[in-house]
Design a protein with these regions (language model features):
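The short loop immediately C-terminal to the conserved phospho-acceptor aspartate in CheY-like receiver
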Residues: 14, 57-58
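Active-site beta3 strand of CheY-like receiver
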Residues: 48-54
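C-terminal output helix
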Residues: 109-118
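Acidic catalytic/metal-coordinating carboxylates
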Residues: 37-40, 63-67
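The feature encodes the CheY-like receiver
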Residues: 18, 60-61, 74, 89
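Alpha4 helix (beta4-alpha4-beta5 surface) of REC/receiver domains from two-component response regulators
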Residues: 66, 88-103, 116
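Charged docking surfaces used in two-component/phosphorelay signaling
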Residues: 19-27
Length: 136
């Protein structure tokens, strides 16, 4: 699958992390949408129906968990989600998995780790892997 055909919604209140993710993912060819809090993230997700949601667990106005609970109950079904968090708790991770989170990445993290998780969730093959269509 070609990244240019995919939209990713970043929902995080940390400006530096959002801008780092945006720069790297736009350079990979993804279309990036940004929301700075849970309420905005929920509105953008419902309006745009992105291919992937990268969601911070702890944010103002509505936590990542509340966003997931709302999205899970919507008619369109769950958007594939990678949760990022500074929280270490195993109960949080277990609840995220119960809500259908595809990957759970602890802050701080290497951007390469996030990119690998995104590629895995979206089925994007890295360059050089068999079957990758490398147009010059």
């Amino acid at each position: 699958m070609n990244p240019q055909q995919r939209t990713i919604l970043l929902v995080d209140d940390d400006h530096e992390i959002v801008e780092s993710m945006r720069t790297i993912l736009e350079n990979k060819g993804y279309r990036i949408l940004v929301a700075r809090d849970g309420n905005s993230g929920l509105m953008v997700a419902e309006r745009e129906n992105p291919d992937l949601l990268i969601l911070d667990m702890m944010m103002p106005k509505k936590s990542g968990f509340l966003v997931l609970e709302k999205l899970r109950s919507r008619p369109g079904g769950m958007i594939p989600t990678i949760m990022i968090t500074g929280n270490e708790g195993s109960r949080h991770r277990a609840y995220a998995e119960m809500l259908g989170v595809r990957d759970y990445i602890r802050k701080p993290f290497a951007m390469e780790k996030l990119v690998r998780a995104i590629d895995k969730v979206l089925g994007v093959k890295p360059r050089g892997e068999a079957g990758f269509d490398d147009e010059g």
